[in-house]
């Protein structure tokens, strides 16, 4: 905890093509080693693929996909008298968004055998349709929270 008061979150400027902060955050999650232009090509290429396949606005598809993947609950370890309990807590909106984007990108990277823009597009479409690796990760987290519901009173 900082002694100089609360830390204010940085303002992320929207991306130039879709004028969306969400797309900019996705670009930042895809980026490796500071190579932003490559990350932009991947994300914009994926958005073009989504537009071709769904005939819908890719931004609304992405927003719905992220909304589907965003977890509501997570478990945090809490030490009580020598035992460590996994305590379920609600996920704040900023952390939920961050986790959703991270899981979508990770699931896209785990797919093999095609270019990254195609993998990312397919993962976003899967998340849009409530299937895929990122949705599996969210369901796994919700199952953990459900299994440890008995420890919910240890919340802090």
Swiss-Prot record:
UniProtKB keywords: Ribonucleoprotein, Ribosomal protein, RNA-binding, rRNA-binding, tRNA-binding
Q: Which residues cross the membrane?
A: none
Might you name a Gene Ontology BP term for this protein? ribosomal small subunit assembly
- Top-level taxonomic group: Bacteria
Q: Name one Pfam family in it.
A: Ribosomal_S7
MF GO annotations: mRNA binding; rRNA binding; structural constituent of ribosome; tRNA binding
Annotated GO CC locations? cytosolic small ribosomal subunit; ribosome
Which HAMAP family does this chain map to?
A: Ribosomal_uS7_B
Q: Which family does it belong to?
A: Belongs to the universal ribosomal protein uS7 family.
Q: What does this protein do?
A: One of the primary rRNA binding proteins, it binds directly to 16S rRNA where it nucleates assembly of the head domain of the 30S subunit. Is located at the subunit interface close to the decoding center, probably blocks exit of the E-site tRNA.
Subunit structure of this entry? Answer: Part of the 30S ribosomal subunit. Contacts proteins S9 and S11.
Can you name this protein? Answer: Small ribosomal subunit protein uS7
């Amino acid at each position: 905890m900082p002694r100089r008061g609360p830390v204010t979150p940085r303002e992320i400027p929207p991306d130039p093509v879709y004028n969306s902060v969400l797309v900019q955050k996705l670009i930042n999650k895809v980026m490796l080693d500071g190579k932003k232009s490559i990350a932009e090509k991947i994300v914009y290429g994926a958005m073009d693929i989504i537009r071709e396949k769904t005939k819908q606005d890719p931004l609304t598809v992405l927003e719905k996909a992220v909304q589907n993947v965003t977890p509501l609950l997570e478990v945090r370890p809490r030490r009580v008298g020598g035992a460590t309990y996994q305590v379920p807590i609600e996920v704040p909106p900023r952390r939920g968004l961050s986790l959703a984007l991270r899981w979508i990108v990770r699931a896209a990277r785990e797919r093999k055998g095609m270019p990254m823009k195609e993998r990312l597009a397919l993962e976003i479409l899967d998340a849009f349709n409530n299937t895929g690796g990122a949705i599996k990760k969210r369901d796994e987290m919700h199952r953990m929270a459900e299994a440890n519901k008995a420890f919910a009173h240890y919340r802090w």
